[in-house]
Amino acid sequence: MKGILGRKVGMTQIYSETGTAIPVTVIEVKPNVVTKVLTKQSNGYEAVQLSVFDKREKLSNKPETGHFKKANTTPKRFVKEIRNMNGYELGQSVLVNIFSVGELVDVSGTSKGKGFAGAIKRYNQHIGPKSHGGGGGSQPIRQTGSLGDISGNRVFKGMTMPGHLGSEKATLQNLEVVKVDLKENLLLVKGSVPGAKNSFVVVKSAVKGLPAKAAVKLVDVKEVVLMNELVEKAKKLNVEVKVGMHSDELRPLIEQAELEAAKEKEGE
């Protein structure tokens, strides 16, 4: 098992070489610090405590500050244990590149809070009849149905009734890792992820152990836009553009052609 802590940035879409638009969630994964190593002998189970995102020292108490000093780091905002994650030492950093492109992961977060909701929205119950006497009064169309047998003389726990919706732990399984950006500390996973923007999430290797998918070859949209602009300039200056040419290769040729054109104008 391996895992890492991060923060949901939001959703966007990227493009593959075949032109397919892939909806992805961007997760900011700054270097996680191992702030505690739990062993079976001392704690009864094996786990690693990860911490990420700095917190002001005045907002942490002395025991908390001392705990982070043992790992030679500053107080952190987001702290979680990842079970059965072996091979790490106290104070060691865990980077986003522990996951690879095509790997399947489980992402856990806190779902968006919806406040007080009825049984139709909360449990997807069927709406009541809108005609034949079901439009209101004693039979409103959004009212809950039966709450149990009359012989029970009470409402049993667990009945589907109105109440608070959302703001609870939710996990989406088998999300594909589309891109790993070590330079910007970003992880892009295919599809949506529980929680609002800037909410904390936990990314773990998939529990179901399904095989990884083939890495998708992505297109750099900025590079494509830049190349289109350079190709138009190249046509005007009669610069030869070869198939598969990169902008770094084409730009010097265009600059050289522009200098030659400027010299010709001066000579005239």
From Swiss-Prot:
Domain of life: Bacteria
Keyword RNA-binding assigned: yes
Xref: InterPro entries: Ribosomal_uL3, Ribosomal_uL3_bac/org-type, Ribosomal_uL3_CS, Transl_B-barrel_sf
Keywords: Ribonucleoprotein, Ribosomal protein, RNA-binding, rRNA-binding
GO BP, sorted A to Z: translation
Keyword Ribonucleoprotein among record annotations: yes
GO cellular component labels: cytosolic large ribosomal subunit
GO molecular function: rRNA binding; structural constituent of ribosome
Function in brief: One of the primary rRNA binding proteins, it binds directly near the 3'-end of the 23S rRNA, where it nucleates assembly of the 50S subunit.
Similarity comment: Belongs to the universal ribosomal protein uL3 family.
Protein name: Large ribosomal subunit protein uL3
Gene: rplC
